Design a protein with these regions (language model features):
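Cyclic nucleotide-binding regulatory domains
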Residues: 13-14, 18-81
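A small-molecule sensor/coupling module
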Residues: 73, 92-121
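Conserved active-site beta-strand element of glycosyltransferases/polysaccharide synthases
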Residues: 86
Length: 121
């Protein structure tokens, strides 16, 4: 399913416990988990406040930072077991967003605004 992307971007093999990105990092790359398992976690005041959000093989993660142009990552992504990922560079994601149909882009941003506001209420 991801063979074409793997040919273009390659893949990385990661050991269990490898940090893919850390909360507050400024990079905007996206990732596809080819196989393995990744846990998302986040901290507040140096205490873990959320854990147990898992990414499974075939899922995309880390793209919201680029999609919604946020300043920093809200989560830390760490492999739970040996895993393989494809990294999609920020510039590729940005180009896809720029080329996206304007109506679909509007819908996506409206959905995000609605989701974000409902979680703060």
């Amino acid at each position: 399913m991801f063979a074409e992307l793997e040919k273009i971007f390659g893949k990385q093999k990661l050991v269990a416990g490898a940090m893919i990105y850390q909360q507050n990092d400024a990079d905007h790359n996206g990732y596809i988990l080819l196989n393995g398992k990744v846990e998302l976690s986040r901290r507040h005041n140096n205490k873990v406040i959320e854990r147990g959000v898992f990414i499974s093989s075939g899922q995309v993660f880390g793209v919201f930072t680029s999609l919604f142009n946020t300043k920093a990552r809200r989560w830390t992504a760490t492999t739970v077991i040996a895993s393989e990922i494809i990294t999609i560079p920020e510039k590729v994601i940005d180009k896809k967003i720029e080329d996206m149909d304007p109506f679909l882009r509007y819908c996506l941003f409206q959905w995000y605004a609605l989701e974000h506001s409902s979680k703060q209420n």
